[in-house]
């Protein structure tokens, strides 16, 4: 018995159901081409505004003990967002704090269900924030927001490191501050 779609349960999305059906058919006809689902599944809700996610969210990652940081960029400051009038949309990247490996992303706003494929591909290929910083995005495009979300993430990470170093230096007594014995 092969099953696909809503009967399988979560996530009950058309895109996932179609991939489940392809896998089921390959198993049913013993075709070796596509024998399993991909590990990275994007979720998209075609509402106004569109909402899309992939990978782990910030809370989920922390609940699993993964030390993460985020980077965000608003469509309000993105030239394409300004042109099309989407000033409420944003992209959010979730990455591991130790090696900057991308583990999740969210997009809210115009084209979110299309844009989510950029971080989905990055997660699939184990990309870090460096990918988004080094990538060249068309201008003006909403996709360019990923670059600025990566820069924001690096700034947040730097602030975290600076605070930790500052706390460590306060906890360590300075040389020469001890009172000499009398």
Which positions does each model-derived feature cover?
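Rossmann-like dinucleotide/flavin-binding elements
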Residues: 1-39, 99-100
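Flexible, glycine-rich terminal cap/loop adjacent to redox cofactors
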Residues: 29-30, 34, 46-182
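Helix-loop-beta segment of a Rossmann-like dinucleotide-binding subdomain
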Residues: 40-45
């Amino acid at each position: 018995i092969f099953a696909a779609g809503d009967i399988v349960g979560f996530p009950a999305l058309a895109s996932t159901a179609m991939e489940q059906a392809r896998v089921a058919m390959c198993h049913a006809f013993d075709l070796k081409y596509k024998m399993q689902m991909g590990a990275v599944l994007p979720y998209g809700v075609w509402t106004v505004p569109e909402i899309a996610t992939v990978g782990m969210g910030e809370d989920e990652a922390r609940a699993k003990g993964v030390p993460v940081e985020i980077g965000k960029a608003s469509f309000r400051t993105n030239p394409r967002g300004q042109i099309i009038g989407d000033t409420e949309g944003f992209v959010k990247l979730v990455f591991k704090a130790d090696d900057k490996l991308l583990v999740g992303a969210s997009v809210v706003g115009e084209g979110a269900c299309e844009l989510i494929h950029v971080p989905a591909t990055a997660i699939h290929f184990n990309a870090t924030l460096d990918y988004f910083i080094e990538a060249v995005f068309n201008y003006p495009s909403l996709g360019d927001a990923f670059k600025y979300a990566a820069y924001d993430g690096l700034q947040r990470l730097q602030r975290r490191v600076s605070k930790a170093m500052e706390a460590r230096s306060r906890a360590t007594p300075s040389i020469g501050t001890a009172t000499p014995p009398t």
